[in-house]
């Protein structure tokens, strides 16, 4: 992916959180 590496830790966490909630893997990843 050609995304610039300017993501902050919070942005990465938010992105992961949204992806996890969107795919339903939150049930598999208790973190």
Swiss-Prot record:
Molecular function in Gene Ontology: oxygen evolving activity
Gene Ontology BP term (one): photosystem II assembly
Coiled coil regions in record: none
Alphabetized UniProt keyword annotations: Chloroplast, Manganese, Membrane, Photosynthesis, Photosystem II, Plastid, Thylakoid
UniProt key word Chloroplast: yes
One GO cellular component term: photosystem II oxygen evolving complex
Classification via InterPro entries: PsbO (IPR002628)
Primary location recorded for the protein, binned into one broad class: plastid
Localization annotation: Plastid, Chloroplast thylakoid membrane
The family this protein is said to belong to: Belongs to the PsbO family.
Function: Stabilizes the manganese cluster which is the primary site of water splitting.
UniProt protein name: Oxygen-evolving enhancer protein 1, chloroplastic
Gene source species: Brassica campestris (Field mustard)
